[in-house]
Amino acid sequence: AQEVDLRSFLDAMPKHEYDPAQGFAGSPYQPDQSKRTTIYPAKLAEYGRQYGDVADFSGRSVEELQRELLSGNPVVVYVTLWWAEPYYRTYRMGDHEETLLRNNHAVLLCGYDSQTDQYNVADPYNVKCQGQDYFYWQDASVLEPLYLVRQHAVVVR
């Protein structure tokens, strides 16, 4: 993959007023309670391909996720903020409303340790808002059920 810093990547990412299937809805820098602030995996993968071999990995099993990580391929997974239970709210999406996950959060998985059954997580939000480590290990028993809520993911090969 091409070298690009996070700020440049986020600044150039496609944006959309409200639809995460068309681009990042809202701002990647500021929370906005009125919008579903995210970008869906297919659009993120499409954008990411300009930097390297990136693919929408949504719908894949936990075992497939682990295989990618054990092959050295990082994977963006959509889980929940602070690993909390999922909760939902209704958002205006143009001319209609949709009930969507409210506490959505995306993190980068950098590895998997099959001996400890833990994932190596890169989470810049963890530093900014919690004063915690950028990289940390998360138990599979916490991560996997949250991944399986939607099975949204993007792999970088």
Question: Where do the model's predicted regions map?
Answer:
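Cysteine-nucleophile protease catalytic domains, especially the papain-like/related folds used
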Residues: 1-65, 70-73, 151
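Short, glycine/acidic-rich beta->alpha junctions
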Residues: 57, 101-104
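Envelope-exposed proteins and targeting segments
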Residues: 73, 103-105, 117
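A short, Trp-centered hydrophobic/proline-enriched beta-strand micro-motif
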Residues: 75-79
